[in-house]
Amino acid sequence: MMACRDPKPGAKRLVRAQTLQKQRRAPVGPRAPPPDEEDPRLKCKNCGAFGHMARSTRCPMKCWKAALVPPTLGKKEGKENLKPWKPQVEANPGPLNKDKGEKEERPRQQDPQRKALLHIFSGKPPEKPLPNRKGSTESSVYLRVASGPMPVHTTSKRPRVDPVLADRSATEMSDRGSALASLSPLRKASLSSSSSLGPKERQTGAAADIPQPAVRHQGPEPLLVVKPTHSSPEGGCREVPQAASKTHGLLQAISPQAQDKRPAVTSQPCPPAATHSLGLGSNLSFGPGAKRPAQAPIQACLNFPKKPRLGPFQIPESAIQGGELGAPEYLQPPPATTELGPSTSPQMGRRTPAQVSSVDRQPPHSRPCLPTAQACTMSHHPATSHDGAQPLRVLFRRLENGRWSSSLLAAPSFHSPEKPGAFLAQSPHVSEKSEVPRVRVPPNVLYEDLQVSSSSEDSDSDLE
């Protein structure tokens, strides 16, 4: 019985088990429909046809024998814009589109009207159309002719000067420049100030032979009197004009009644630029040699270049008789009290005439400048009588507080032996200590001995 049994049931079991395993390995996704059942929503990725998938046996790409050419799809008009430069006109445009179209048409119609109105009001001819190239080449000849307005000549250019006047002014300037070049810098300043005066003032100054007293000015700007001369022997006291000389005339005619009245002595400081601008050519009177005390720098009146053959005590006849304009006027010693303010010590305030003349005769290059001196004073006494008078020398000292004290030094005269005796009687120790080097004096002694105030000057001038 056992042999008669069919072994097929065991084989069937194995086949079933294999099929179950294959089913388990398969993906869980949807299965493809049978070939008879097609879904038009599906599209084949290989051929791009609808109704089957790429793995379907109906795909023509898998079975080329049954492959068919896919039919061409019909064109849909309006889908593609074949002429994009032409706007599409809608059949029923909206209200907004209508307004835009009307606004575009209005300015086109108004353009010719505006042009006509502009031609009427402006009066210009209507614009002509541009000519062709042939016409332009022919009309270019007419464009070369200048049709613009003539240039207007303005007065910005300087007027033309007459050549005769120009030559005359050039010669005058050259002569003036050569004359100034031969003079010292101090005299250049005086000549430049005198040249700034008008012709009328020069004539009045030339006609006046009267000695001019110093004028007292009350104001912030100091004024110094300058008398320009061509010959300046030693002893003449001159000052450099500064900023005040630009506004006031220096040469003024004084009535003869002013001769009897003695003018007040003025002592006014100058701007410091005057002393710094002095070169080596200017004559300055100092102590013996180049020695001077450090704390009290001494500066006397400025002396202009003098004639080499004039002696220290010779007086030209022009000075005695009055002479021409510019003749040197010598300061006369006042009676008794010849110093301003309190009397100074004879050791520091007096110098012998020989010492003064020896200092003045020194060459210009051996005289050092005074950069520390910041002011200069001027004392002017008009000559009452020129008979036998000798020039005076004014000695200036600078104090601690910035003030300046002045003292008069009279030169001995051979014609009047009385005055030198009086002068030597007042200062007996001058001749003895003139050759001895100066002793350094403390500043407090100088301040006590040499302090001069404006009140003391006024009182001394009134007494004299």
Swiss-Prot record:
Biased composition (Basic and acidic residues): 74-83, 97-114
Lineage top rank: taxon: Eukaryota
Residue segments, region Disordered: 1-42, 70-293, 312-390, 410-442
InterPro entries hit by this protein: FAM90, Znf-CCHC_6
A Pfam family annotated for this UniProt entry: zf-CCHC_6
Organism: Homo sapiens (Human)
Family per similarity comment: Belongs to the FAM90 family.
Protein name: Protein FAM90A26
Low complexity bias spans: 178-197
